[in-house]
C-alpha cells in the first residue's frame, strides 16, 4: 500500500508542483518553513536529482525505509560508474549506429547526402529526372542518425539507474548548447554529448570546456571553423580546385568570426556581466583562429576525430585580452584562454547562479549561490564536489524549495513515463508528437 501511495504522491506532485512553483517563482527561496519529512526528502531528491520515481523505487523505499533509501540514493548517484546498466538499455544503445560511428564517418555521411541533394537539384534545373531512389538511399544514411541521438538520450533518462548523471548531462548539454538544425551539427550531436559532455558532468569543468571547444559540433555551430586571420589564402592545391569550382568560393573562410568567442565568455563562462568588453571578444576570437576541422578525413572516408589546429589560419600577433598581453603562441593561446576563463571568479559566480536556479529556485538564495561559487573556486571546478555542495546545502532541502520548480515538457514527459513504468518501443514516436 505504501508503494502505491509513494507513486501516487509522485504523480500528484507533478500537478501540484506546477501550482506551487507558480506561487514561489515570484520570490527568492528562503528556508523558513517546517523541515521536510523523510518521505518528502526522498521524493524531492528523486524528482530534482532525477526524472522522478519508478514503481521499483517505491518498492525499494518501502523495503529499506525512506531514510536508508535516501542515504543510499544520494551516495550511489555521485558514483554513477558503480551502478550497473540494465541489459535491455545496453542492448538498445548498442543497436544505434550513431553511437558507434566516428566523427569523420558521421561528417562523411552528411556530405554524401548533401552532395546527392545538390546533384538532384542540378538535374532538375536542367530538366532532367533525378534518381529519386538513389537520393532517398543516401538521405536514409543521415536521417536515422539525427533521430538516434534523441533516442539514446530519452532511453537513458528513462532506464538508467544513474539518474543524477542523466539530469546533469541535460543541464550541461543545455549550458553548452548546439543547434542540431545547422548544417552537419545534427549528425554530430550524439557524439558531442557522448564525448564532450557526458564524461565530464561529474568531472572537471575545464575538461568539459576544452572538449566542447574542440568538438566539430561546436566549431560548426558557432562558426569558429570559419574564423581565420585577415588576409588568409587557401593552399595552392585548394586554389586550383576552387578555380574549377567557383561556386564553392563562398565557403572559403575570409576573416575573423567572433560568434564562438562571444558565446564562450557570455554564456559558457564569465556571464553577461562578467567584466569584459567588446575588445576582449575580438581579441579572444583572434586567439582562437586556426581552431577548426580536418575535413579531408571525411572526404576520403577517413576515421577519427576532426579537430585540427591550422597555423596558417591563426593570427600570430600579440593580443591584449582581459587586461593582459598574450604573445603569439599558436594553439596554446586558445588553451591559455580556456584556463583563464575556467578559473575566473566571474565564471564561478555565473555557474553557481545558473546551477542554483536549475535545481532550487528561479530566484535562489544568495547564501546558496555563494556556497556553490566557493566550492567551485576551492576545488578548481570539480563538478562532483560542486554537485555535492548543492546536495549538502540546507537551502536545497528547504520547505520553500520543495516542489518550487516547473518541469519542462521534456522532464514532465519523462517523469510521467517513469511513474507509469513505461518504455516506448520506439522513442522517436514520442519525440515527434
Protein language model regions, located:
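Structured, charged N-terminal subsegments at the starts of enzyme catalytic cores
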Residues: 137-141, 145-170, 174
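N-terminal export signals
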Residues: 6-24
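Short, flexible active-site-proximal loops enriched in glycine and acidic residues
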Residues: 164, 168, 180-188, 221-223
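His/Asp/Glu-rich metal/cofactor-coordinating catalytic motifs and the adjacent surface-exposed loops
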Residues: 28-133, 137, 191-194, 198-352, ...
Amino acid at each position: 500500500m505504501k508503494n502505491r501511495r509513494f507513486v501516487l504522491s509522485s504523480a500528484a506532485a507533478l500537478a501540484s508542483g506546477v501550482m506551487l512553483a507558480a506561487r514561489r517563482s515570484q520570490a527568492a527561496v528562503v528556508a523558513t518553513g517546517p523541515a521536510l519529512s523523510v518521505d518528502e526528502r526522498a521524493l524531492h531528491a528523486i524528482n530534482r536529482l532525477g526524472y522522478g520515481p519508478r514503481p521499483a523505487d517505491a518498492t525499494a523505499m518501502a523495503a529499506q525505509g525512506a531514510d536508508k533509501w535516501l542515504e543510499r540514493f544520494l551516495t550511489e548517484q555521485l558514483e554513477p560508474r558503480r551502478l550497473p546498466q540494465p541489459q535491455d538499455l545496453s542492448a538498445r544503445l548498442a543497436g544505434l549506429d550513431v553511437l558507434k560511428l566516428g566523427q569523420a564517418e558521421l561528417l562523411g555521411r552528411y556530405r554524401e547526402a548533401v552532395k546527392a541533394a545538390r546533384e538532384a537539384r542540378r538535374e532538375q534545373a536542367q530538366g532532367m529526372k533525378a534518381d529519386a531512389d538513389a537520393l532517398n538511399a543516401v538521405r536514409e544514411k543521415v536521417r536515422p542518425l539525427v533521430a538516434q541521438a534523441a533516442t539514446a538520450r530519452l532511453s537513458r533518462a528513462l532506464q538508467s539507474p544513474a539518474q543524477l548523471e542523466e539530469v546533469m548531462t541535460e543541464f550541461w548539454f543545455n549550458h553548452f548548447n548546439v543547434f542540431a538544425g545547422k548544417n552537419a551539427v545534427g549528425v554530430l550531436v550524439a557524439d558531442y554529448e557522448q564525448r564532450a559532455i557526458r564524461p565530464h558532468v561529474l568531472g572537471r569543468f575545464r575538461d568539459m570546456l576544452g572538449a566542447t571547444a574542440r568538438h566539430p559540433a561546436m566549431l560548426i555551430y558557432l562558426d569558429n571553423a570559419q574564423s581565420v586571420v585577415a588576409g588568409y589564402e587557401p593552399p595552392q592545391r585548394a586554389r586550383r580546385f576552387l578555380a574549377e569550382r567557383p561556386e564553392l568560393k563562398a565557403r572559403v573562410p575570409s576573416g575573423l568570426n567572433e560568434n564562438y568567442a562571444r558565446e564562450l565568455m557570455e554564456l559558457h563562462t564569465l556571464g553577461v556581466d562578467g567584466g569584459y568588453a567588446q575588445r576582449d571578444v575580438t581579441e579572444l576570437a583572434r586567439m582562437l583562429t586556426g581552431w577548426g576541422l580536418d575535413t579531408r578525413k571525411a572526404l576520403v572516408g577517413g576515421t577519427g576525430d576532426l579537430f585540427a589546429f591550422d597555423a596558417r589560419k591563426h593570427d600570430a600577433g600579440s593580443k591584449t585580452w582581459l587586461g593582459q598581453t598574450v604573445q603569439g603562441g599558436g594553439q596554446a593561446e586558445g588553451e591559455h584562454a580556456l584556463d583563464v576563463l575556467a578559473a575566473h571568479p566571474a565564471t564561478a559566480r555565473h555557474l553557481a547562479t545558473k546551477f542554483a536556479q536549475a535545481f532550487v529556485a528561479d530566484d535562489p538564495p544568495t547564501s546558496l549561490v555563494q556556497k556553490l561559487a566557493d566550492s567551485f573556486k576551492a576545488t578548481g571546478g570539480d563538478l562532483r564536489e560542486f554537485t555535492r555542495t548543492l546536495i549538502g546545502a540546507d537551502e536545497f532541502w528547504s520547505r520553500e524549495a520543495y516542489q518550487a520548480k516547473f518541469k519542462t515538457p521534456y522532464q514532465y514527459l519523462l517523469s510521467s513515463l517513469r511513474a507509469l513504468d513505461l518504455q516506448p518501443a520506439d522513442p522517436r514516436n514520442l519525440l515527434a508528437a
